[in-house]
Swiss-Prot record:
The active site is at residues 177, 260, 364. GO terms for cellular component: cytosol. Cell wall formation. Pathway: Cell wall biogenesis; peptidoglycan biosynthesis. One of its GO terms (molecular function) is UDP-N-acetylmuramate dehydrogenase activity. This is UDP-N-acetylenolpyruvoylglucosamine reductase. It catalyses: UDP-N-acetyl-alpha-D-muramate + NADP(+) = UDP-N-acetyl-3-O-(1-carboxyvinyl)-alpha-D-glucosamine + NADPH + H(+). One of its GO terms (biological process) is cell division. Residues 29-205 form the FAD-binding PCMH-type domain. The keyword NADP applies. Keywords: Cell cycle, Cell division, Cell shape, Cell wall biogenesis/degradation, Cytoplasm, FAD, Flavoprotein, NADP, Oxidoreductase, Peptidoglycan synthesis. Belongs to the MurB family.
Amino acid sequence: MKSSGAGAAFAGASVADAAPLAPLTTLRVGPTARRLITCASSEQVIATLRRLDTERLAGQRDPVLVFAGGSNLVISDALSDLTAVRLANDGITVEGNLVRAQAGAVWDDVVLTAIEHGLGGLECLSGIPGSAGATPIQNVGAYGAEVSDTLTRVRVLDRGSGQVRWVPGTELEFGYRTSVFKRRADDGLEIPSVVLEVEFALDASGRSAPVRYGELAAELKVPVGQRADPRTVREAVLALRARKGMVLDAADHDTWSVGSFFTNPVVAPDVYERLAGSVDGPVPHYPAPGGVKLAAGWLVERAGFGKGYPVPDPGGPEAPCRLSTKHALALTNRGTARSDDVIALARTIRDGVRSVFGITLVPEPVLLGCRL
């Protein structure tokens, strides 16, 4: 990777040619981009994308990938003609009970900052890798909480008009692991709007949000629905995530992943009843708008894909991509995986679950240049 010296064209943003993208993603898979533009401020992001979009209209540019933390991406190794724009604008400010974070801020830093200011509401989202700007796109959630619970508005760049404006959270059409941003992005490359900044309204009482998730309540030894100290909740969440290999650790290949690869499917009540009647023992399920939410990890394991699948023969080579040995929903890079390895394993698991249960799992990460 070498600097191209073209930063002046992008308001001083850093520009590098022949830039490997794999080290910039949590899965550590991806191509060498033709050009990587790293924007350290929102002004650089705006100037860079306006220029690239002008070039696009003139038919003079490569496909453009906009990303930050790289925690929810599977990028095809074949996409070598990319111009990648990395958001590194990372400011975090607190005013009263409002927390504002620029898109490139490390998400867990946002959570910790809120807690250090005595604000509750984000603590269940501790330890989730990635950037603040990505959280509303997926409506990131964990342990009974979602970003949409506390998000008040986002500042976005409309790439069609070039205008920048604040959009209320009520206009973002949030759903389970989705939003208007995700629904409008055809392939993850031609995204019509880019998040520049997010704002959250949090609880200044010194208490957490109500603990809604049974596993977390058990870890805290409190009843479901009770509030607790946000810092204590954060510590419990981090402990739970670490036991599942869901806290990034460069030395642990179980954490080289995009987190849960499949979303928990929501099925019609009669589908759940048929499933419950066809297996021994209880089927984990939860009420959900429009049906019943099933546990994707349970479906994966019951379909024959246990933790660590495929397990290598004694003394034999390890597959380049395996399920985590700690969590059945995490597809992990064991050190040499390429995008084709990840997609092949994901396809095997999806097809296996569909064959056994008649339920099709949907991938949670953004797939760029590849599909199941």
